[in-house]
Amino acid sequence: YIRFIKIMYFDKENPLSRSSSTNVSTAILGSSQIVAEKNGELLIGVDNLFLTEALHQITRGFVPGGMNKNPFRIGKLAKDRTKYVSLNNYPENTDLVVQYVYSNPVPTNWGSDKGLTDARSVNAVVQHSLIQMPENNFKPRYEDPRVGYFTTQVTDMTAADDPTPYRDMIHKWHLEKKNPSQERSEVVEPITWWIENTTPNELRDAVRDGVLAWNKAFEEAGFINAVDVKIQPDDADWDAGDIRYNVLRWASSPSPPFSGYGPSFVNPRTGQILGADIMLEYSSFTYRVKTEKIFETFSSDNMVRDEKSCQFSHVMQENNMFAMIASRSIGDFSPLEQHRIIYESLVDLSLHEIGHTLGLSHNFYASHLHTLNNIHDRHITEPIGLYSSVMDYTSANVGPDSKHHGQFYSTTPGPYDIWAIEYGYTPSLDNPEDEKERQEVLLSKSTKNEYGYGNDADDMRRAGKGIDPRVMLYDMSNDPMGYAQQRMDIIKSIFPSLLTRFEAPGESYHFFRSAFSILNRQYGSSARIISRFVGGVYMDRSMVGQKGKEDPFIPVPREEQKWAMTLLGKYLFSADAFDFSEEMYSHLQWQRRGWSGTKDPKIHDMVLNMQKGVLDQLLHQNVLKRISDTELYGNTYTLSQMMNDLTTACFSSDAGSNVTTMRINLQTEYTRRLISVVHNKGKSKYDHASVALSYENLNKIKKYASKVKSVNEATKAHRKHLIYIIDKALDT
């Protein structure tokens, strides 16, 4: 299966089509000799294609200056050990499975013991699929930026008057009505999913319910029973390699690179989806937590970076455990409640991954469907969904107390999902002008909140990425800051009784430590959600003249940005933000296994990494520049005010008293970051306003640090050190 990443279209009636290959570099990935030829058919040797990286590159180059100074390297391809594992011919596809062996005789990074037996030899098994392209009456549908589908990009090189000459085709299945004249009809051939016999029996009903729930959306597009589900018999005479079977598969890996993944195979000429499989990881529904790294994963450097893959279920395990911890601590945690958490999460995961295989991309705006008051009311959320699209990455929805426990996850396609399926799958009208008008009427609804859309290119998961705080991962409700504050208050209320609830006679403190970690990860995630409103810009992709449209860019109102800084000051930067008991700290012990690493909890590192994750955002060059830029079109929360508020949050509360060790870390970290801005070296390039205001705030810090009367020796030493590093930096 060879995908054409970019395609250029030339109208054959246009003389320019005669020069369609001019200034276009075509890649020659491999070559092979013709062994035999008969009646126009060729026999070639394929080893140069399939036993090398010609068709699929596995090794990656080393990036100089990267954060990881000693990255894991798989080595060079060992051609003498690389081999074919299997060759399977099916009626509509041929699969070649190749085991690539890489050799690194002297590795400096031995990797992880999770699935890697010896770093000197790494095996990668890759399946190459050759798929027969169909010949049918499938009609492509072209993308619109207001609704999110995966696409095959096509640029019209002969369109003279169109500023956006795009003919990008959305990816969709070929569905036909049995009775085309009826508004709603049974389908000729449904999209049939097979639940593989590897699926644990106790999970099959939830998976089935999640798949079949999509029929609700297809009915709005005119199709009845468009999606079907079957169970693979144990004695089935077919396997998942046959493209005629769309299979939901399960695995239980030691350290999976994904937890739920829904790839599909597409005809690059039309956008028709030819087949799909979904791989789900059982580890997402277990209590296995990587506690050896729980105190290292709060900064934005460790946020999910691969926007092209689906990592939804990676976080679902943590979300499920948080829901169980919270329910056990603030409500009546019964076996029925535990079942509901697992059931709803698995239905939601199935909906999400099936959505990808239907062609839908992520929609990280979708969590804004309900108000903060309604989000915990099952009677409101169950009929239409907890969020407007199951294609979002959300956290488990946990209420503030046992009386306000709504849905944990969504169990039905939301309003956006139904609208998107209606756009992509409703059969075209015979008259092109009528069809264009029909689509415009449907797309004109995009200004409504329930149809809001923002994908991976728009989201703010990483520091400095994106601009619209509504397009964020793991947030909830149309008041994300209010929900994040509520989440942090819930976590704070759980901590005092956490040890007594999670210690069991005869057991180690491993589960308690895991619970402590998960609560803090959720706490840090809430802080990052809040931080995105500072310097944020609300974005609207409505078309000119569309009813209900707003300006394309609207700065987040001043009062919202100020409130975000207030919340961060209280919940993240203040002296009592992490006021845990000594008893809790002294019991953070994981169960011994082997002898690697020190076992004492690195508490200061945990807290500082959480604070770093927010400072990464607030002091990112993109954010500081954007605050200055948005002052030109409506932002009244100036860069000067923001940086002054940040300095105040880090220094003012203990200006005349002793400074705790956690605040010493924070103040030193913040000071060093301002120094870095002033020096303005390396890859990050700050504008002059950011440099000047950083310089000004360093002088303010010197004034804070000059107060050394009536404080202990540690505080005196800390403040003298701040003055020293500031003077040294400004003198160079």
Predicted regions and their residues:
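Generic secondary-structure boundary/loop-capping signal
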Residues: I170, Y245, F258, P263, ...
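Conserved catalytic/binding loops enriched for acidic/polar residues
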Residues: E337, I341, S367-T732
